[in-house]
Amino acid sequence: MALRLPALLDANAPWGPPSTVPEDLKFDDVPYAPFSKGDKLGKVADWAAETKDGKDQKRTQFGKNFRDPYHAYGASSASFFTNEDAEELSSFSVVDNAKNANKPRGTATVLKTRGGAPRGGSFAGRGGSQRGGRFQNQPGRGPVGGQRGPNPRFGKSKFGWRDFDKPQRIRNASVDITDDWTEIQEITYSEMQKLSYDVAQGVEIDTYGDLFPYDRKFDRTNNITKLAHLGRTVFNTTTSEDPIMQELAKDPANRIFITDTILSQIMCTTKSVAPWDIVITKKGEQLFFDKREGGPLDFITVDENAADPPADSTDKDNINSSANLGFEATLINQNFASNAITEDPKSKVSYKANPFSNNDSNVLCHAYKYKKFNLSDDPEGAPLNLILRTEVDALGPDGTTLNLRVLNEYGSSEWKNKFNTGRGAIIAAELKHNLNKISRWTVQSILGDVDQMKIGFASRVSPKDNTQHNIIGVVSREPKQFAEQINVNLNNGWGIFKSVVNIATAKDDGKYVLVKDPNNPAVKIYKPAAGF
């Protein structure tokens, strides 16, 4: 077969390519290599550069001496034209027949927290559930450091490293909200934290009841005292049923009526977690704030702010359920108030007759102080008087007044061994787990002009018996100083309450319910159905 040379084109010029390119010589279906403006000019190839691709995610490319960013495209892309047969690769596998060395038994796996150290918490007190790598003692949840028994890092103990994956606890509202209820407004905690309102010192109207001196034997160290059940009658009358409030309501200048139990909860709303509700009744120009009989405000919460609070349970035999613990804490506080006073008739201080008792000798001695606050925005204008009922529990030295409160331990009995040496750690743990409750106690004491708070620490005689308790010790706190220590801002509390008052004042006459959202940091105001 003869070799035929292709015909040469006539050159119009002796130098350079022809002005037209034949069709058979034009480039067709030739891959185009994308380029990058970051490519260095003059570098044809860098054979010493390390090949990187999208699979290399372990190294950071932004180190101290980082200069030339690597581009996954352009001239420096080493695998752009690489053709890999997916089917061939999928049928290929490598078998590793090397034997893995067994770890020697007894080698502990160290659970590290972020930063290489625990983020907080202590071993004192009840503590909280182990979260984030810190071990703390929670009743019924295994041993703790320093406690005899198996090492909590082995066996069935939980590290808590998958606590983030636990389903969130769903609570029910404290009141049954039906479809015929109308939601009026929602206020979130973030909005409440920005509120502030300055209220002048209240004016005392009158005081009712009796007071006995405080028994100072409870202040002694190493003095574990059995808490006796004296069975005193305790009155917790709501606002609208208070005969003194009813008498003061006859004055049209008095516009708002409330008790310290209810007001302290509203002022400490942003610290509350457990659900609660308050009934607001508008009658003309007057507002009455009431609690429901047998509702959440009749009982004291336990470990409300803990990371793993007591579970809600309908089992009456579960003494550590939230409901049973609340009932237990309420009884302990009532018994402590009757145990920690010296009932000497010669030392008794009497005010006006107790408005709630009919000369019952078994009534727990209390003093009820009624005060007036002006919530008007214009101090020189018409007053917006708030009538508040506060309580005082006992007398201190030199005629000072005291409030008596108790924190209770359940599930274990560590306080009696650690209270004298680890008192600070126990108090810090209680502040963490019961912040709302302690904040409310502090606000109540400030509103009632109480000079000192006596906070007792009660522990069960037996962890499985919730009827017998010992008072391990008592600490004293000055309310205003204590409020600063635990970050209780009264101006913020007054701002929250004033906002609720403004909302209720603008509505028509009737009943409204202020409800703490059980699962979100917010409160809602509802217009309930008729007949509520």
UniProtKB/Swiss-Prot annotation:
GO cellular component: cytosol; eukaryotic 43S preinitiation complex; eukaryotic 48S preinitiation complex; eukaryotic translation initiation factor 3 complex; eukaryotic translation initiation factor 3 complex, eIF3e; eukaryotic translation initiation factor 3 complex, eIF3m
InterPro entries for the chain: eIF3d
Annotated region described as Disordered, given as residue ranges: 108-161
Biased composition (Low complexity): 132-141
Keywords: Cytoplasm, Initiation factor, Protein biosynthesis, RNA-binding
Bias (Gly residues): 117-131
SUBUNIT field: Component of the eukaryotic translation initiation factor 3 (eIF-3) complex.
Function statement: mRNA cap-binding component of the eukaryotic translation initiation factor 3 (eIF-3) complex, which is involved in protein synthesis of a specialized repertoire of mRNAs and, together with other initiation factors, stimulates binding of mRNA and methionyl-tRNAi to the 40S ribosome. The eIF-3 complex specifically targets and initiates translation of a subset of mRNAs involved in cell proliferation. In the eIF-3 complex, eif3d specifically recognizes and binds the 7-methylguanosine cap of a subset of mRNAs.
HAMAP family cross-referenced by the UniProt entry: eIF3d (MF_03003)
Family (UniProt): Belongs to the eIF-3 subunit D family.
UniProt free text on domains: The RNA gate region regulates mRNA cap recognition to prevent promiscuous mRNA-binding before assembly of eif3d into the full eukaryotic translation initiation factor 3 (eIF-3) complex.
Official protein name in the record: Eukaryotic translation initiation factor 3 subunit D
Organism this protein belongs to: Yarrowia lipolytica (strain CLIB 122 / E 150)
